[in-house]
């Protein structure tokens, strides 16, 4: 009996010790609790984050600031928010109002493209419907019944920033439920840790808002997981013919596209209410970078000033890319 009592006492002590360790690990302020299965998923960078909602919020660590070299003035910009981030080292090289929520207009189409890529095959057929054409469309030649693969549709979204195509993609990918598509956009933003971001529609004509820091997170995720999305945006001009023999001429809305050495991809945004936005991903010998301008009366001038500032401050040349 005495031996049985000792064994029981030892078992109780072991249970108390294990419980104390669990509570310490669970509630320690310096180590946030993450479910065990989520920890293993965090190491699989090829998995879409939206697959594991909502547990993967803030998986990516915040970008950290880097002091500006002494004697070099900050770039002159008119934007409400702007910044330059080294996506390779995760360093913010310069930023102004990086966490302020600003209207982003058609930068929304980056998230639209990401959600579509994660939830539909490249060969998915996008058919233009009458409901898609009740919005101002860049390409006036689009007609009801025009058919495109999803990859072809991405060219419309990311080169000419076509609004009707964005509506058609969202409607098709979620089987007619555009509201569910927008909900997935917001859930994906939350999973990525984009805490200053909110989407109302897949086009960018509503009150879609984000911040410089959040757009840097999105750009890094796209480049790391779906780099083809940025490659779609790299054409200054593209002639596309559909299976029905219809020809479409797509012109890039980024008018300084060919003036940026090493460019990987870009996306513009503009409405009279929120002003102009421009996100540019480029590569140099020191890594991959993203320049972001939000709410600017001169988005192209601001971006040019940021890139010029970087060339002088970092002693790096923008010539390692395409």
Cite the ranges covered by each PLM segment:
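Active-site-adjacent loops and short helices of periplasmic peptidoglycan-processing enzymes
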Residues: 25-216, 220-224, 285
